[in-house]
């Protein structure tokens, strides 16, 4: 007799059918009781996803009201006013992850909606210093290296530039 035959069933092999309950939302809606609630939750997978999304939305609305003093309707009005995109980069649209509410840390005034990258790494890193951001614009428009050594293409970019032409 092999080792497997002598082994008693472990906890992973238990029959949990007796512990399953019908989904409470399916029962409330009068749906046929074919979908079991996953142990230990009271809802089937479909209703669990719906409940989780609703709870997430409600907690988000509560958080932006408490943190920034704006309602969900005001958030979406700003979103529409900005064209449904991050105001700085115009790339992020908030479909996968909602845009962040940006505010001035000195005055507390809500300024608009930005993606995480722009809010955290552009404005956050610059600490809202207009002079620093202006220097960055000047740097991009008139690079100091071009003024000193002239336009010189970096070897790591040369192959890419040749293949594009």
Curated annotation (Swiss-Prot):
Disulfide bridges in this chain: none
Superkingdom to which the source organism belongs: Viruses
Protein name: Gene 59 protein
Name of the coding gene: 59
């Amino acid at each position: 007799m092999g080792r497997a035959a002598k082994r008693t069933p472990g906890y992973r092999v238990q029959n949990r059918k007796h512990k399953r309950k019908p989904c409470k939302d399916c029962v409330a809606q009068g749906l046929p009781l074919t979908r079991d609630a996953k142990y230990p939750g009271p809802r089937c997978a479909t209703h669990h996803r719906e409940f989780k999304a609703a709870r997430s939305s409600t907690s988000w609305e509560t958080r932006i009201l408490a943190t920034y003093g704006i309602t969900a309707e005001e958030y979406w009005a700003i979103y529409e006013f900005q064209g449904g995109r991050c105001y700085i980069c115009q790339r992020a649209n908030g479909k996968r992850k909602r845009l962040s509410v940006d505010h001035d840390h000195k005055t507390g005034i809500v300024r608009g909606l930005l993606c995480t990258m722009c809010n955290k790494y552009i404005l956050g890193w610059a600490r809202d210093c207009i002079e620093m951001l202006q220097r960055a614009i000047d740097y991009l428009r008139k690079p100091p290296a071009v003024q000193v050594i002239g336009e010189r293409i970096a070897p790591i970019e040369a192959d890419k530039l040749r293949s594009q032409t």
